[in-house]
Amino acid sequence: MAKFVFITGGVVSSIGKGIVAASLGRLLKSRGYNVSILKLDPYLNVDPGTMSPFQHGEVFVTEDGAETDLDLGHYERFTDTAMSRLNSVTTGSIYQSVINKERRGDYNGGTVQVIPHITGEIRERIHRVASNSNADVVITEIGGTVGDIESLPFLEAIREFREDVGRNDLAYIHVTLLPFIGTSGELKTKPTQHSVKELRSIGIQPDVLICRSDRDISDDLKRKIGGFCGVPTRAVIPSLDADSIYAVPLILEQEGLCREVLDVLNLTDHDSDMAAWEQLVNKLRNPGPSVKIALVGKYVQLNDAYLSVVEALQHACIAQDASLDLHWVCAEQIEADGADTLLRGMDAVVVPGGFGNRGVDGKIAAIRCAREQRVPFLGLCLGMQTAVIEWARNQAGLTGATSAELDENTPHPVIHLLPEQQDVVDLGGTMRLGVYPCRIAPGTLAQRLYGDEVVYERHRHRYEFNNSYRNLFLESGYVVSGTSPDGRLVELIELKGHPFFTACQYHPEFLSRPGQPHPLFRGLIEAAQQRLPDSPAEALRQQGDIAIP
């Protein structure tokens, strides 16, 4: 039978509950426990698929095609365990399910209420993850902050959960902030006390407190916090600001988090194997020469909009002993100032996914610059589509070529709507989503990087390369290096005679891991290193990846 851990947050939002959940998952897995992690989000959207990246950040896509919160990316990267649509729950999806049941008559004419029906649905979702994942421990992160109206049904549900499984089979962790007041020179505990008081008023007594701080927390202060909050001093866990999120599991391990959680759950504290993770963090902290990577996007004002792309670049840099010098380049700014100006001195260019017209011309200009100046280039999803448009206009002689998404009346729709999308009306959850196979062409850059004939990648798109133009592209020098197994859909393209120019319709960033970077990203960083004096790139490639158990 599974054990359950619930993680709440107080004082401020964005306090790092997702990283705590992912880190605890890593620590439990290092002790031999199977782990699954789910996120309860208090917003009324059914999923984040139609939300603006400026409001929500990246949409992370699971293997089974769920559009989810970016925290699921952290869960997968830290635990190297695939999550599913069951691991992402929103208030909107809960209410949708309950209302559908009411319409079907499942409640036999009863009055449908927040308690017990909404809270019961939430509890059922948590139990479903446990039964489907065969996890020894299910970790649940509750989004939002204690005290928010939106979070109340979730907090009530996890309080009720205690009656479902018994007090010895679950643990409550509360993540809070200790602000430092410069004028008094003190860390203040009162916000934490009030946050725990609010949590206790709901009926939840935390077993462990994780205290975020930018400086050391004294033993006296830990005793004070524990005394006021009803938590043993040893269970007051400091979590100081770290230089990397990948250092957080090591910090929490040193502070005894996993030991305390296992004690509450009555589980054995097996020996931990974090040696490979320590090696990874050590490489991250002691990199080789830096590579300048330009990320050309539409949403660069919010870094979280491209979180998995940035992490994938970091993973590749760790493997290649490189320091990531990331330059955020606004695609619209390129339209104003020119690609040659804004991309001068870059060792590689990445154009990630996106939607809509805004910034597209800037992306096309960046791709042309990378192609003509032989700068390593990687395009992802819309990045591949804009690479196709750039080639069509500037090399294949197709004046006015573009995507049907951007201009329905274009004379040359080199990118067009997938046939199965023709009659789709709803926006949410209707794209080509999840894992699909891709057959790699022999003798290509892609084959060298992947080393496999068939690979499986995650998708999120409605538009695809228009096969009416495939022969023209092939004749003009384009290489189709990856297709669907039936050869119908173009999934991966590259250019001959260029140091590194490839683009894919899928999202490889979702499969990159700290100890196992995605081949396309590692290839990009290797190519970027080739532009450095005395490049060590090829020798480093032969070292292989860090095997994290």
From Swiss-Prot:
Allosterically activated by GTP, when glutamine is the substrate; GTP has no effect on the reaction when ammonia is the substrate. The allosteric effector GTP functions by stabilizing the protein conformation that binds the tetrahedral intermediate(s) formed during glutamine hydrolysis. Inhibited by the product CTP, via allosteric rather than competitive inhibition. L-glutamine binds at G354, L382, G383, M384, Q385, E405, R462. It comes from the Bacteria. It catalyses: UTP + L-glutamine + ATP + H2O = CTP + L-glutamate + ADP + phosphate + 2 H(+); L-glutamine + H2O = L-glutamate + NH4(+); UTP + NH4(+) + ATP = CTP + ADP + phosphate + 2 H(+). Residues 292-534 form the Glutamine amidotransferase type-1 domain. PROSITE patterns: GATASE_TYPE_1 (PS51273). GO terms for biological process: 'de novo' CTP biosynthetic process; pyrimidine nucleobase biosynthetic process. InterPro entries: Class_I_gatase-like, CTP_synthase, CTP_synthase_N, GATASE, GATase1_CTP_Synthase, P-loop_NTPase. GO terms for cellular component: cytosol. Residues 1-267 are annotated as: Amidoligase domain. The active site is at C381 (nucleophile), H507, E509. Keywords: ATP-binding, Glutamine amidotransferase, Ligase, Magnesium, Metal-binding, Nucleotide-binding, Pyrimidine biosynthesis. ATP binds at S14, I15, G16, K17, G18, I19, D71. CTP binds at S13, D148, I149, E150, K188, T189, K190, P191, T192, Q193, K224. GO terms for molecular function: ATP binding; CTP synthase activity; glutaminase activity; identical protein binding; metal ion binding. Its EC number is 6.3.4.2. Homotetramer. Catalyzes the ATP-dependent amination of UTP to CTP with either L-glutamine or ammonia as the source of nitrogen. Regulates intracellular CTP levels through interactions with the four ribonucleotide triphosphates. Belongs to the CTP synthase family. CTPSs have evolved a hybrid strategy for distinguishing between UTP and CTP. The overlapping regions of the product feedback inhibitory and substrate sites recognize a common feature in both compounds, the triphosphate moiety. To differentiate isosteric substrate and product pyrimidine rings, an additional pocket far from the expected kinase/ligase catalytic site, specifically recognizes the cytosine and ribose portions of the product inhibitor. This is CTP synthase. It comes from Synechococcus sp. (strain CC9605). The gene is pyrG.
